[in-house]
């Protein structure tokens, strides 16, 4: 989807967002749009501006410049101030709700899963859902009617009366997701939703998120896992030093910025290959630790030369992926959190 297309069809629009803290520019002129049923992934190294961007989208941090607009596609299940549940959107909703003036109306259509659990440890799973629904002004009867469905969706029916401390990490993340769905949101904002989960728990979380996308829910996702981004996201927004440096589908970004074939060479003496005649067989190469990465349009001749001249070195031939893209655009140097 092209940027102009995205803006025309958008459920959610952020235009020219900027944020400064003193003399430091944290986010600079960032724009993006999210269509109904689309997952937009925001990726970037530590300090790229991801968290600040999400906080601005949630209305928790006021941008110094730019605008945020939400275009409801249906009436929500949450009553607005002075109105009943499931009422038709008014003319203002149809023309777009704006932050900060329409913050309450927008938040009623959002679901949020933060990186760290914010579940109430004193309440059971079912009670966590009930209490959270009350924050949206929902009637207890309406919330209780949704709880069995939400627990089933999260594969937690058998844990309805258990407290969060009795759950595994994966169960707590799924309960957080179920809680974010209490108000039947049109847009989910997920901050590192599978951090700390084992592979089985991650895959179950991905399955649930894909189900939501199939039902038309939109998702704004931040992640450090490139396999997660490639699996879930229809488009990616790449941030670095507060600026948008790329946007597009995962496959298009890979095709536009990378050579199709990657050969990893590792083992004793592999680093010396960076200055060997083999470098002429690659469009570019990178050295990271004891591994040399050759990026090439066709790896056949390179692989033959490696097998003949360096039989003791280990090689891995694979297609270019999002991790290669991420490292090319943002560098291999580790950045610590501020």
Task: List each language-model region with its residue ranges.
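Conserved ABC transporter NBD signature motif
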Residues: 66-76, 86, 90-99, 105-106
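Conserved ABC ATPase "signature" region
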Residues: 130, 134, 141-159
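ABC transporter nucleotide-binding domain
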Residues: 206-297
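Conserved ABC ATPase signature
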Residues: 163-167
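Conserved catalytic motifs of ABC-family nucleotide-binding domains
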Residues: 184
């Amino acid at each position: 989807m092209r940027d102009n297309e995205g803006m025309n069809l958008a459920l959610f629009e952020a235009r020219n967002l900027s944020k400064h803290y003193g003399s430091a520019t944290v986010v600079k002129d960032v724009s993006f749009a999210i269509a109904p049923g689309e997952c937009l992934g925001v990726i970037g190294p530590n300090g790229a501006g991801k968290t600040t961007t999400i906080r601005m989208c949630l209305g928790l941090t006021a941008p110094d410049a730019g605008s945020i607009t939400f275009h409801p596609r249906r009436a929500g299940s949450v009553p607005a101030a002075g109105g009943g549940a499931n009422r038709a959107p008014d003319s203002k909703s149809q023309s777009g709700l704006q932050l900060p003036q329409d913050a309450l109306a927008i938040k009623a259509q959002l679901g949020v899963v933060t990186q760290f659990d914010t579940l109430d440890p004193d309440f059971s799973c079912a009670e966590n859902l009930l209490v959270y629904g009350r924050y949206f002004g929902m009637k207890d009867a309406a919330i209780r009617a949704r709880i069995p469905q939400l627990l089933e969706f999260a594969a937690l029916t058998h844990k309805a009366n258990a407290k969060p401390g009795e759950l595994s990490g994966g169960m707590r993340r799924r309960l957080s997701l179920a809680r974010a769905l209490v108000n039947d949101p049109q847009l989910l904002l997920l901050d590192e939703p599978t951090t700390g989960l084992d592979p089985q728990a991650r895959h179950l979380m991905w399955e649930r998120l894909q189900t939501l996308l199939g039902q038309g829910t939109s998702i704004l996702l931040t992640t450090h896992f490139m396999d997660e981004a490639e699996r879930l996201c229809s488009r990616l927004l790449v941030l670095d030093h507060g600026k948008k440096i790329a946007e597009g589908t995962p496959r298009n970004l890979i095709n536009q910025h990378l050579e199709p074939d990657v050969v990893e060479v590792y083992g004793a003496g592999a680093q010396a290959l960076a200055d060997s005649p083999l470098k002429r067989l690659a469009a570019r190469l990178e050295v990271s630790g004891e591994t040399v990465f050759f990026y090439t349009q066709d790896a056949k001749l390179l692989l033959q030369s490696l097998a003949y001249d360096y039989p003791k070195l280990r090689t891995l031939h694979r297609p270019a992926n999002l991790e290669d893209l991420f490292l090319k655009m943002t560098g291999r140097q580790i950045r610590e959190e501020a």
